[in-house]
């Protein structure tokens, strides 16, 4: 995987910028790495890791800030034949300890400001400050001789609905990302890709790092404070041509930053969105204000994105997009069976298990792994339907469906209506337990600045636009919706909400 992502570009254009690191959105980059420099650092880190005496395939847990060091160590471990485990710097000590123990990592790279006291005996600890010295060590490794199905990296799911579980990917995962190149990004070697997320997320590791490098393009990393208003300035300073973020950030940029159809976004060609359902009107508002298109994708840690719109796949209102060229996708019955449903019928979105981008499996979770496999298909839990032209309409997550008066209600349907209320800035819905035996639909609302917090107004608005059983019975006002470090909604937190 490391040879495919880095080695080819280093051989073809060694002096071309591979990575630009910005600490200030309005100043030149603080670090500029060529492909040759990236490869040299990665292979020297690989040699330093080999000197630690790790077993083949050993897990290497990364607990560092989102810097170039993180990216170099991730690929250095892969180049040596080890299995990096990227983690968020925002994890609590207990959360990080769980990942360390559950993964059985043999080496932990950790920054001084990210404490972790209960480290199991036998785990080697590398101070994060030492990694740059490893990148300059005298020894230089060669790429490990790995097979396509050998483990390459281990990602833990964000845990929005349950305890995190490890998703183990093979070296072929990098090859399995090829349908995204033109099926979502429309990427060329001339592009500069700016992703706003952290490296522990597959969206960032793939879209923001792996795929640009595999295409000989330039990746951009920002390490400064992430106020929504700074992104247009950084896009201009970095001369970014592709921008990737969660939908919420695009909405915040429109609200808090100065953007227009002129030069406010510099050379930007288009934006990419994934990670959560976009709020109603986002595509139209962004295009109207900036003159640029947004292209959406649907995916998951187990497969990454596999359904999308793109410069080559026109966006259809209400649909995520189409299965990327080369993907085998179907809609299967919710209650079992492997025969795909006809166009227009809602069911479980499934990807064929022959897809090279599909995970090897869940780390030490055979029972949970069995639940997502059905014959030749992998089922990730997304409800969807496919129209006669192959466009996929996402209908929510199967485990997010709310039950009200015997009916099944998708939270996204209610959210789409409530988001049109003039006092609503953001909204999320979930089934709330009000008594031991009674659950109702709850709406969690972040009000617009200066708006009155009037729950009855929200309820009346819903009653005029939704069937009675779909209307929220409780409205809870929040200063902010609960989100993961990468901006994804933590709907599980809302499900566990209890009224005072």
Question: Residue locations for each model-derived region?
Answer:
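Conserved pre-ATP/AMP-binding loop-to-beta segment of ANL
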Residues: 14-17, 137-156, 162-163, 186-192
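Conserved AMP-binding/adenylate-forming core of the ANL superfamily
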Residues: 19-67, 71-75, 92-97
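Conserved AMP-binding A3 loop
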Residues: 31-36, 152-176
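AMP-binding/adenylate-forming catalytic core of the ANL superfamily
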Residues: 91, 243, 355, 360-361, ...
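Conserved AMP-binding/adenylation subdomain of ANL enzymes
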Residues: 175-192, 202-242, 256
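Gly/Ser/Thr-rich phosphate-binding loop
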Residues: 240-245, 254-316, 328, 338
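Conserved ATP/PPi-binding loop(s) of AMP-dependent carboxylate-activating enzymes
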Residues: 326, 337-371, 409
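Conserved beta-loop-beta connector loops within the AMP-binding
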Residues: 330-352, 386-389, 451-455, 490
């Amino acid at each position: 995987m490391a040879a495919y992502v880095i080695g080819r570009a280093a051989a073809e254009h060694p002096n071309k910028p591979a990575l630009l690191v910005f600490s200030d959105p309005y100043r030149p980059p603080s670090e500029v790495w060529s492909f040759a420099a990236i490869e040299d650092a990665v292979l020297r880190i690989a040699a330093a890791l080999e000197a630690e005496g790790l077993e083949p395939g050993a897990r290497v847990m990364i607990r560092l800030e989102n810097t170039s060091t993180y990216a170099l160590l991730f690929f250095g471990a892969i180049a040596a034949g080890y299995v990096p485990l990227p983690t968020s710097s925002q994890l609590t000590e207990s959360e990080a300890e769980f990942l360390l123990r559950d993964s059985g990592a043999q080496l932990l790279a950790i920054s001084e400001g990210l404490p972790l006291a209960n480290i199991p005996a036998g785990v080697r600890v590398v101070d994060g400050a030492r990694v740059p010295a490893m990148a300059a060590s005298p020894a230089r490794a060669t790429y490990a001789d790995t097979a396509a199905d050998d483990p390459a990296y281990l990602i833990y799911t964000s845990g929005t609905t349950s305890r995190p579980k490890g998703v183990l990917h093979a070296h072929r995962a990098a090859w399995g990302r090829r349908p995204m190149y033109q099926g979502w990004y429309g990427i060329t070697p001339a592009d500069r890709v700016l992703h706003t997320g952290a490296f522990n997320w597959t969206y960032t590791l793939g879209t923001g790092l792996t795929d640009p490098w595999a295409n000989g393009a330039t990746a951009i990393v920002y390490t400064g404070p992430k106020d929504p208003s700074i992104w247009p300035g950084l896009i201009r300073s970095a001369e970014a041509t592709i921008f990737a973020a969660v939908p919420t950030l695009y909405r915040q940029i429109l609200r808090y930053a100065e953007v227009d159809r002129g030069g406010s976004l510099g050379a930007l060609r288009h934006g990419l969105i994934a990670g959560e359902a976009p709020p109603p009107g986002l595509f139209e508002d962004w295009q109207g204000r900036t003159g640029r298109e947004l292209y959406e994708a649907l995916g998951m840690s187990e497969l990454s994105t596999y359904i999308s719109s793109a410069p080559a796949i026109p966006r259809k209102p209400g649909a995520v997009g189409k299965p990327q060229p080369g993907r085998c996708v179907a809609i299967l019955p919710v209650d079992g069976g492997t025969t795909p449903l006809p166009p227009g019928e809602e069911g479980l979105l499934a990807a064929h298990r022959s897809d090279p981008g599909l995970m090897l499996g869940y780390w030490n979770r055979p029972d949970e792994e069995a639940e997502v496999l059905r014959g030749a298909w992998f089922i990730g839990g997304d409800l969807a339907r496919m129209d006669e032209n192959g466009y996929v309409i996402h209908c929510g997550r199967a485990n997010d469906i709310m039950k009200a008066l015997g009916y099944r209600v998708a939270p996204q349907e209610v959210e789409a209506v409530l988001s049109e209320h003039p006092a609503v800035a953001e909204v999320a819905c979930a089934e709330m337990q009000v008594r031991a035996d009674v659950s109702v639909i709850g709406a969690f609302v972040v009000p617009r600045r200066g708006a009155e917090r009037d729950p009855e107004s929200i309820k009346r608005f819903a009653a005029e636009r939704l069937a009675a059983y779909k209307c929220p019975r409780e409205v809870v006002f929040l200063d902010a919706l609960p989100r993961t470090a990468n901006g994804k909604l933590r709907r599980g937190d809302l499900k566990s909400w209890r009224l005072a």
